[in-house]
């Protein structure tokens, strides 16, 4: 979520309510959505000597007519072998990923793209952070958009052989659904569309997220917004549309993720996350392991010495006693950060993944800011 301190203070009790026992699971079939196979779009560059992110429009083949998704991308000066699709979180747009995309292209030689999910309500910057405001939980649309843009780059840039999808927070919901949908969107040679999925502090159980938002909505503006945005995506409340909610929960689609052919998953989550509870990462990791999908789980314990603000459960509790309290434990990072330990760990793991270090058979890692990673 965007770094807005008043919003963060309001958001922390939302996660606290979720941690205190609002998890819900339900069975579901394949996520609803079209068979996404072929995409027409505006021309994209495969190489660029200019250190910038360009705009991109992608046609998404949904019924009754195709729709356009807008986004931004950056490409290196040499032919890229890897594409990274970044899926943004709640309150963010593709603009939050400009610096990450430029770094990816310049420093790692990969093409990088982020899409503004169709249906998201985007308005000008209102808090002075230089980023537009955004409302909407358009995760199924974002999943379709992510598939469409990946297909577009593969069709245009023949040098790309590997595609990694990387989602943060709500983007974990989006990217997980994209991998599930991709079981029906494989490449022409039958290989998986997405080779790897990186799930960073991901909201992979939207039923749990909605339950927490609903509990706090009467007394919490942030929770009320989240509740309303989720209901808009689902077409009603959970009681009215339980099957739709189940269809949008990534944890209900392990079979589809397995069928997509994804080669492995990396899960990164702060132990003291105050927005998306750590239990969602544990649930996701357990299901992936049960399905024999190679998975690396990184639990972030203590923070590093970076000055980034985050949202943590202990930080919220301590802040009730001392407004200046700063928890030593890692909470929910802003996806724009290049120094918070959660984002540093996730991005470092992305680059090593691209470099050839694939996830293992259920590896567990503890990351401690002051002392390092174990084992």
Locate predicted features.
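Short substrate-entry loop that stabilizes the transition state in hydrolases
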Residues: 80, 86-124, 207
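C-terminal catalytic histidine-bearing segment of alpha/beta-hydrolase fold enzymes
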Residues: 279-375
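Primarily recognizes the serine-hydrolase "nucleophile elbow" in alpha/beta-hydrolase
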Residues: 152-156, 160-217
